[in-house]
Amino acid sequence: MAAQNAFEQKKRAILNEIDSTQPDLSPKGTIDELCLPIIDLINASADMVTTSSCSGRVSVFLEGTKSYNGEVKIGGKGQGGKWLYVTHDREKVIGWLDELKSKSEFSFELSGKEIPTEKVTGSIRYILYKYEPFILHVKCRDFQAASKLYNTAMSCGFRESGIGSNNLVAIRINIKLDVPLGYLDETSGTLKFFVTPEYVSVLDSLSLSKFDENTRKMQALYDRIEKELINCAPDVNSKVNITPIETKEERRERKKREGMERQRQLKSPQNVL
């Protein structure tokens, strides 16, 4: 009962936060509109509550300083990392480069030239283009509820999903892009792209395709959750036998009965030589 009360208290607190007009901690500051239907669906269940979400986004990120106390952290974001561009809106993918150039504090060089060999070090601050798909975290009342949600997500192709501590289910899919576009020349303060504008257009087209695939997957997940977890009352006319889950005590008693039955059969006259 205490665990149930703790879950219900947590759920009430989360739902109050969702209803609040205060910005959240994400770069956008609000729940993505595309996530609202599936969030509302899941939160309608007494056994689940959503804790965080992202409907999918395109971002351009400038890595921060990677050296710390004389050590270089390869590939780390480090200190001073900066979001150059972020959008969760499919319609705002095309044209991000022009918008970034008009607003950025940096100057730009789109030469398409490779990085000079002498500058390729572990401390270089790369410009990273990313498409990140839908992700949803759901806290469940117990492991049984978490397992049902996990299995439902996996059956829809969300193969990166998992169950963490406290019955927290992470629903993820691997349709991402993660591509370096250039680097920051810290001497001149210039963002130097070693890809061409044409290559950026190719990435944008790929991202649009991934947005579309992502939306289809989200809809498939919504439909499956609605069918299997929300509107899942058994059909009284169904011929399928539904086997109830055994408790530990029931399993212990069954094993005891089976053992006694085996002993009885071994002692029967037909088994005596």
Swiss-Prot record:
Residues 243-273 are annotated as: Disordered. One of its GO terms (cellular component) is cytoplasm. GO terms for molecular function: tRNA methyltransferase activity. It catalyses: 4-demethyl-7-[(3S)-3-amino-3-carboxypropyl]wyosine(37) in tRNA(Phe) + S-adenosyl-L-methionine = 7-[(3S)-3-amino-3-carboxypropyl]wyosine(37) in tRNA(Phe) + S-adenosyl-L-homocysteine + H(+). The modification Phosphoserine is found at residues 26, 238. One of its GO terms (biological process) is wybutosine biosynthetic process. It is an enzyme of class 2 (transferase). The keyword Phosphoprotein applies. Pathway: tRNA modification; wybutosine-tRNA(Phe) biosynthesis. Residues 246-264 have a biased composition (Basic and acidic residues). InterPro entries: tRNA_yW-synthesising, tRNA_yW-synthesising-like_sf. Its EC number is 2.1.1.282. Keywords: Methyltransferase, Phosphoprotein, S-adenosyl-L-methionine, Transferase, tRNA processing. Present with 3390 molecules/cell in log phase SD medium. S-adenosyl-L-methionine-dependent methyltransferase that acts as a component of the wybutosine biosynthesis pathway. Wybutosine is a hyper modified guanosine with a tricyclic base found at the 3'-position adjacent to the anticodon of eukaryotic phenylalanine tRNA. PANTHER family: TRNA WYBUTOSINE-SYNTHESIZING PROTEIN 3. Belongs to the TYW3 family. This is tRNA wybutosine-synthesizing protein 3. It comes from Saccharomyces cerevisiae (strain ATCC 204508 / S288c). The lineage of its organism: Eukaryota, Fungi, Dikarya, Ascomycota, Saccharomycotina. The gene is TYW3.
